[in-house]
């Protein structure tokens, strides 16, 4: 089991799939990382040699991933809320940000229904 960016990658999966278990790496970036590290993307993680794992670590290290990315996103949202702009207010209230309707639907963002008090 290889450990990259503080995440244990599942040994039985292909490299390009396993890299996606790192927060901030999706399909496209995963395949580009394999290509730039010189690793065949369809190789299983358990079959990687130590130099290949090191090359992957170096390539992943060039991107903001995991805790640093989560922190950056949190800071960006907090900045919007502190500014008091429309998007910040929507974050603060827990409503959808991008113009979706809220009269019906939007339950995922708003949470479960609140009981009506009389």
From Swiss-Prot:
Residues 92-118 are annotated as: Disordered. Keywords: Ribonucleoprotein, Ribosomal protein, RNA-binding, rRNA-binding, tRNA-binding. GO terms for cellular component: cytosol; small ribosomal subunit. One of its GO terms (biological process) is translation. Disulfide bonds: none annotated. SUPFAM superfamilies: S13-like H2TH domain (SSF46946). Gene3D superfamilies: 1.10.8.50, 30s ribosomal protein s13, domain 2. One of its GO terms (molecular function) is rRNA binding. It comes from the Bacteria. Part of the 30S ribosomal subunit. Forms a loose heterodimer with protein S19. Forms two bridges to the 50S subunit in the 70S ribosome. HAMAP family: Ribosomal_uS13. Located at the top of the head of the 30S subunit, it contacts several helices of the 16S rRNA. In the 70S ribosome it contacts the 23S rRNA (bridge B1a) and protein L5 of the 50S subunit (bridge B1b), connecting the 2 subunits; these bridges are implicated in subunit movement. Contacts the tRNAs in the A and P-sites. NCBIfam families: uS13_bact (TIGR03631). Belongs to the universal ribosomal protein uS13 family. This is Small ribosomal subunit protein uS13. It comes from Xanthomonas campestris pv. campestris (strain ATCC 33913 / DSM 3586 / NCPPB 528 / LMG 568 / P 25).
């Amino acid at each position: 089991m290889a450990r990259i960016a503080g995440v244990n990658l599942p040994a039985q999966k292909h490299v390009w799939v396993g890299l996606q278990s790192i927060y901030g790496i999706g399909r496209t970036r995963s395949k580009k990382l394999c290509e730039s590290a010189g690793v065949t993307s369809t190789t299983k993680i358990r079959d990687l040699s130590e130099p290949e794992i090191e090359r992957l670590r170096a390539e992943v290290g060039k991107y903001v991933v995991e805790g640093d990315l989560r922190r950056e996103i949190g800071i960006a949202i907090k900045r919007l809320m502190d500014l008091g702009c429309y998007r910040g207010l929507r974050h603060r209230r827990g409503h959808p940000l991008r113009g979706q309707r809220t009269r019906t639907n939007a339950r995922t963002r708003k949470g479960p229904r609140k009981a009506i008090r009389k």
